[in-house]
Amino acid sequence: MSDPGFHPESPEPDSLREDQQTLEPVRQALRAYGFWAYGTIDESNRWSIAVDDELGRADVRIGQDGYEIELRAVSPGLYAEEDSPWRRQARTRLARMQIPRVSRGYLQPHQVAIWDEEMEGVGVIETVEMPFQRGEDIPAFVRQRLPRIEELVTMIERELG
């Protein structure tokens, strides 16, 4: 008889539980540091700890050899003040084409610039891995990196004109 808690389209329940247990100390450390941190299942059906901050977002997951930390900053509404919908759409399309070229000079291999459709602005995503034994360093790392990622977003926006 099969386990009633098992759903083929979902990750193995045991794996999710293990990841949740492994990530719980990270969630607690982030909260103790003043972040709003919570556990959730991400878009790839992996357990992660999500952090929402005024400067950006962070997601912490179990990576290949440690904690995978994805940091993201987005500047919303780059062309929101553009009155003409046609002109706003044209500028958005041009920004999507220019972002990869413009970002080459600013970003490291573990960083990527995007056009965020939901927020209608430039975003930068940085993905790094931190060893399991350095889990207590994650809150300070997130606090240090989010402003720097926000600076990258601003530089890319400036280049887009």
Model-identified regions with their sequence ranges:
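Mixed-charge, glycine-accented linear interaction segment located at domain edges/termini
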Residues: A140, Q144-G161
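Secondary-structure transition/turn motif
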Residues: A50-L55, L71-L78, T127-P131
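A short acidic/glycine-rich loop-to-helix N-cap element
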Residues: E129-Q144
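Short, internal acidic amphipathic alpha-helical interface segments
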Residues: V74-I125
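A short amphipathic beta-strand at an alpha->beta junction
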Residues: E12, E18-Q20, Q98, E157-G161
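Charge-rich, low-complexity N-terminal segments
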Residues: M1-E68, P109
